[in-house]
């Protein structure tokens, strides 16, 4: 795929996965036993900053009905086919929740800059939200250098059964002394487990402090045991 096509694809996935309440991206596979999850590196994406960032589309999987797993070697081929066709297939039985994350590649600014770029991609993919937060997203990413890289954490949402929607809420706080330090907080995760045939959700929240101010981001994934 050409680089422009990759840009369009990443924008489409981010926009739908994080801003459409009923977004549903699934791959008709049955998952793989163990901790390893199928993923595909789609290349260097120019996101209009000083340098490109490596972006990875990761497909966490959750077997929903049975434990008959396919050969892991075919997973990447099917995902590649789905991406090359600009399509992400759906399945009634086996869901792949799409997470888009920045890889912790080597950078003089450490992982906080990479993570901030990842957040900027999410926000920047929706012009309406981006325009209400700031005029120049580049300035928002102007974070100071870190002495060492911290353990890179992704914004992950685990779904035990099925899922029916995802939404993200944003809140921009005015400049303050804390934001001038240019730090990011740890991700705080929490989930509400499913009860008997009822609905639940898995929620993550984080905050990024920068010279432009503080932005608080919360993502909630709703799911239902009836799916």
Curated annotation (Swiss-Prot):
Which biological process annotations from GO are given for this protein?
mitochondrial translation
Q: Which domain of life is it from?
A: Eukaryota
List, alphabetically, the GO terms of the cellular component aspect.
mitochondrial small ribosomal subunit
The entry's keywords:
Mitochondrion, Ribonucleoprotein, Ribosomal protein
- Pfam families from the UniProt entry: VAR1 (PF05316)
What GO terms are given for molecular function?
structural constituent of ribosome
* Ranges that cross the membrane: none
Q: Where in the cell is it found?
A: Mitochondrion
Give the signal sequence positions.
none
Q: What's the subunit arrangement here?
A: Component of the mitochondrial small ribosomal subunit (mt-SSU). Mature yeast 74S mitochondrial ribosomes consist of a small (37S) and a large (54S) subunit. The 37S small subunit contains a 15S ribosomal RNA (15S mt-rRNA) and at least 32 different proteins. The 54S large subunit contains a 21S rRNA (21S mt-rRNA) and at least 45 different proteins. uS3m, uS4m and uS5m form the narrow entry site of the mRNA channel.
Q: Which family does it belong to?
A: Belongs to the universal ribosomal protein uS3 family.
What exactly does this protein do?
A: Essential for mitochondrial protein synthesis and required for the maturation of small ribosomal subunits. Component of the mitochondrial ribosome (mitoribosome), a dedicated translation machinery responsible for the synthesis of mitochondrial genome-encoded proteins, including at least some of the essential transmembrane subunits of the mitochondrial respiratory chain. The mitoribosomes are attached to the mitochondrial inner membrane and translation products are cotranslationally integrated into the membrane. uS3m is essential for mitochondrial protein synthesis and required for the maturation of small ribosomal subunits.
- What is the official name of this protein in its record? Small ribosomal subunit protein uS3m
The organism of origin for this protein = Schizosaccharomyces pombe (strain 972 / ATCC 24843) (Fission yeast)
Task: List the top taxonomic levels of the source.
Answer: Eukaryota, Fungi, Dikarya, Ascomycota, Taphrinomycotina
